[in-house]
Regions:
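Short beta-strand elements
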Residues: 159-175
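Short, surface-exposed binding/anchoring microloops in extracellular/periplasmic proteins
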Residues: 62-100
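Short, solvent-exposed, Trp/other aromatic-anchored flexible loops in extracytoplasmic proteins
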Residues: 105-154
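C-terminal segment of classical bacterial N-terminal signal peptides
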Residues: 19-31
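Low-complexity, acidic Ser/Thr/Pro/Gly-rich terminal tails and inter-domain linkers that flank the onset
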Residues: 37-74
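Extracytoplasmic
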Residues: 51, 77-79, 94-96, 142-144, ...
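Bacterial N-terminal signal peptides that target proteins for export
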Residues: 2-18
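Short, hydrophobic/aromatic beta-strand segments
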Residues: 92-98, 111-112, 158-160
Length: 175
């Protein structure tokens, strides 16, 4: 009896380790790729910003800040942008190229650069901002996305966006 219990326990432990290894290897349990939270800020009287802030990893394992936000101005005009922030000195974004959003089915959208809206003094080469207003409603919340960010050195940065973050962006866009 003692031998059977030990053998059963060993088998269960082995199966558990194998399942955990498979899940970790396939990135299913990787919650660090996108942890986000929705925030509401009043920037000025009558001007409100809704934000989704997340942390993403590129294909090299470098962390990026992703801030999707809707700004509603006092006159009622609204915009919805995505700001991507890399580590200073690691990347120089090519602002002459659009941000490409590609879903796992191969559908691609282009988001135009809107970085001139964020820099008052000096352009930061590791920060880019893109206009998602025209396309955010077209993104499917059940399908993961890959963002492709052009760089000056020609090697694009690829960021994986889980469906939950796409859904959060759409929630923010609908405020």
């Amino acid at each position: 009896m003692k031998y059977r219990v030990r053998k059963l326990f060993s088998s269960l432990l082995l199966v558990s380790v194998l399942v955990l290894t498979i899940l970790l290897g396939s990135d299913i349990l990787n919650t660090a790729t996108a942890a986000a939270a929705v925030r509401q800020l009043e920037e000025a009287p009558g001007q409100v910003v809704y934000q989704s802030r997340g942390t993403l990893k590129d294909q090299q394992g470098n962390r990026w800040g992703a801030i999707a936000f809707k700004r509603i101005r006092p006159d009622g005009k609204a915009s919805f942008d995505l700001r991507l922030v890399g580590f200073p000195g690691m990347v120089e974004i090519d602002r002459t190229q659009p941000l490409l959003l590609t879903n796992s089915l191969g559908k691609t959208w282009k988001a135009n650069d809107a970085s001139t809206n964020i820099f008052t003094d000096e352009i930061q080469p590791h920060v880019g901002q893109y206009d998602l207003q025209p396309l955010v409603t077209q993104l499917q919340t059940a399908i993961p996305l890959t963002l492709t960010l052009a760089t000056v050195n020609g090697e694009p940065v690829k960021l994986s966006i889980p469906p939950s973050l796409v859904q959060e962006w759409q929630t923010v866009a609908n405020y």
